[in-house]
Amino acid sequence: NTELTPPPAEIRNLMKAFEDNGYQILVVGGAVRDLILGLEPKDYDLATNAKPDEVKEVVDGVKGYRYVLGPQAEKSVLNLTSLVTIPNEKEAIEITTFRKELGYAGGRTKGVFEPADTFDEDAERRDLTINAMGMTADGKVIDPQGGLEDLQNGVIRAVGDPTQRFVEDPLRMIRAIRFSVRFGLPIDKETYQAIVSNADLVSTLSGRRLRDEIGKVLVEPNGYQLLMETGILPVLMPEFRNMEQYQHKLDYHPEGSLYNHYIEAFKEFTKIPNRTELGAWALLFHDIAKPQTAEWNEEGGYHTFYG
């Protein structure tokens, strides 16, 4: 019976309108997780058993709120997601109909959805248990997948069968790593092993999705290291395979191997308070060509890297 700080009044008023019309509606996803962790949510996403046309009907009846129409909204309706503008907010919020996934097209790049009747069904399709919680307008947590317990125990766990989750959408593996390093929580053993076993699947993802997610990992402490240990980065960039075998001259690099050099470089980078994803990408690429230029110096016992 955990209770959290209720959402802002503008969100509560909208949720009340749905409840008054006989629908269930919840705050879902990251906002619930962040509130449990004592963090300020960046935004509030809602989920309901109302279908998009029913969402529009409810929203049209609430003064000051507007159901967003147009190409962007029509595209969203295909995903059972409605966009609604609310008073005093610049960004529209998303109200998604409870949904279940029937399969994927193009290596998840697009899910095929149908409406679900309950939040329990909706939660089954989410990536991680900590992102599969809901919250009522008065702050009561709804937790069908045990995300609250996992947060309290300090563990990142996939919803259901981790292999199935990652085959459905390989980006979920990188998201699991991101939340692990962001919150300093270890990944559950079964979930971690599923990432290692399925790391090759990330090669099916689009460059844009990879860029957005990996950049968020690299700016966090241990992010680079976990991408390497799980095999994700070597799959995406073969230059990062076998970096341990390349040895620097210790006079210049007392950390020794090229692998250790990157670990130490990212360790220092993540101490910078205002570090950026662009800076992380620059650091990632700064020595990427060394394996291709390496020559062994037999006398000195180290590699040289003359391009």
What does each of the following model-derived ranges do?
Residues 1-307:
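Catalytic cores of the polymerase beta-like nucleotidyltransferase superfamily
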